[in-house]
Amino acid sequence: MIDRYKHQQLRIGLVSPQQISAWATKIIPNGEIVGEVTKPYTFHYKTNKPEKDGLFCERIFGPIKSGICACGNYRVIGDEKDDPKFCEQCGVEFVDSRIRRYQMGYIKLTCPVTHVWYLKRLPSYIANLLDKPLKELEGLVYCDFSFARPITKKPTFLRLRGSFEYEIQSWKYSIPLFFTTQGFDIFRNREISTGAGAIREQLADLDLRIIIENSLVEWKQLGEEGPTGNEWEDRKIVRRKDFLVRRMELAKHFIRTNIEPEWMVLCLLPVLPPELRPIIQIEGGKLMSSDINELYRRVIYRNNTLTDLLTTSRSTPGELVMCQEKLVQEAVDTLLDNGIRGQPMRDGHNKVYKSFSDVIEGKEGRFRETLLGKRVDYSGRSVIVVGPSLSLHRCGLPREIAIELFQTFVIRGLIRQHLASNIGVAKSQIREKKPIVWEILQEVMQGHPVLLNRAPTLHRLGIQSFQPILVEGRTICLHPLVCKGFNADFDGDQMAVHVPLSLEAQAEARLLMFSHMNLLSPAIGDPISVPTQDMLIGLYVLTSGTRRGICANRYNPCNQKNYQNERIYETNYKYTKEPFFCNSYDAIGAYRQKRINLDSPLWLRWQLDQRVIASREVPIEVHYESFGNYHEIYAHYLIVRSVKKETFCIYIRTTVGHISFYREIEEAIQGFSQACSYDT
């Protein structure tokens, strides 16, 4: 069992055969060691009881019913009497039946078997460590060919071949003869090596530190050579350098985690606890079994057949032995990852068997569906919509979701304020949706953050905390600036909301997970809260204005009154006299009174100390008044000057959208400057 206080993380990796044996074996009170599964049977067809030493054996995995052995005897669990704690007839311990959820078994393989994840998955770890092509290793694993291994200094059959100056044409047919004769085991153990055993020997002979040193030397040599001028050769060099880097990283990982490379070849195959691969009886007396049970049975059948060939019959042809070893390897491959070598194995109904990899990987796998994606209390889910009026650290929760999430807190508040005598009365008030309920709910939400999560959670910004506020409707309102961290948009995306309960969780949510504290990407440090999608379109509409220039609009800056008068030219062009405003407040007030539009051009009086004049720009028109004053009209501004060429005032041509955007930027800069001054 995993203690959640002692174990804070879960890691999947390689383990030694000794560790597998320690997990799966146990010593029963009579001193007998059990744990090895030797029979491919599950339940007896007459008694419906688990077969001894089978895949559901009660001696190995524990009793089906707590305190009841296979014989039917009953003992009280935890009784301190001198009664034996196991049945002497069947050897089953009197323990809790929950042990069948975590007690493992093992299959002792007659021949070594490579772990298909480390051989066939890309990149192939075995091929990287051995620095050999994957196809060559596959041919060796599946007994398609062998390689010589003269392990002694004495003359051997294969060494004699090199002592001749010429080679007889029929020499290549002489070695296969040994595969069909008696004494093949002696020849094989002395002369050749094939199958997963050959891979295991090569991995066991590796020195990881020497691999790192040699790979680093070769990488430096390739880097010093420089480009050859041949594009094909340069690509080969780049690929080789990338391979050397991966090989060094893999070797360093093995050293850092104290993993031996030969552990990628299995000698003991773990058997999952029975409760994780159940057989269930449904209506009509039919049985439904997990596919993993059938795959385990296939492995045991083939492994027992190989054992019989090597032990009971001494005259078994070597080709038959190698063929059976290949079948064992393929059976284990199918158990671990069905279909990784091509066509998947199917049952009698042409249905693909669900292997161990299929059980744990993907959206419906054990981790994502049962562990990471399981339903939890104090959580809800809804569609997200944009909340432009929200602060960056706030989110809008629908009343229907909020009252369910904070119901226990509201009940406590009602009882503390003596508005309800007990929990039942408080729940009835919540169902009736009395006004006092919403008041207490708002008080509770003010001091309690919530966590928003959007699947898939690929980095830590996939879960952020917000200060909730009540909103109408049934959707969660979210500030558009936080969407990039969630990789969310408002086209129907859903997000989950969670309530942190413990003080530690609330402190972490406030100090580390608030959205306004996660403005930079944790990976590269770039700003993560930047305008995207809807905000960019809104800013474009806000600041676009009309495309008509000053030449298309014959302005008369002297006529600053009655700017709503309109006249239509012969070209059906609607011309509006553009108004003048002394400050931005008057312009925004006119927009709110619907006297002008958001993109209507206007003239805004500007401060004289802010330069808007380009050095080489010349006026488009100059209008003179009777008193000698004149107006220089440019493309986007005009200047009022006196007879002495003194500047009276400056007007810039802009829109209400530009003014609003400028004021927001100005307030943000002023607030940032004040914050910096307080810090200093």
From Swiss-Prot:
Set out the biological process GO terms recorded for this chain's protein: DNA-templated transcription
Q: Which SUPFAM superfamilies match?
A: beta and beta-prime subunits of DNA dependent RNA-polymerase
Which EC class is this protein assigned?
transferase
Keywords of the record = Chloroplast, DNA-directed RNA polymerase, Magnesium, Metal-binding, Nucleotidyltransferase, Plastid, Transcription, Transferase, Zinc
EC code: 2.7.7.6
Spell out the family assignment given in the record's similarity comment. Answer: Belongs to the RNA polymerase beta' chain family. RpoC1 subfamily.
Q: What is this protein called?
A: DNA-directed RNA polymerase subunit beta'
Q: What organism is listed for this UniProt entry?
A: Barbarea verna
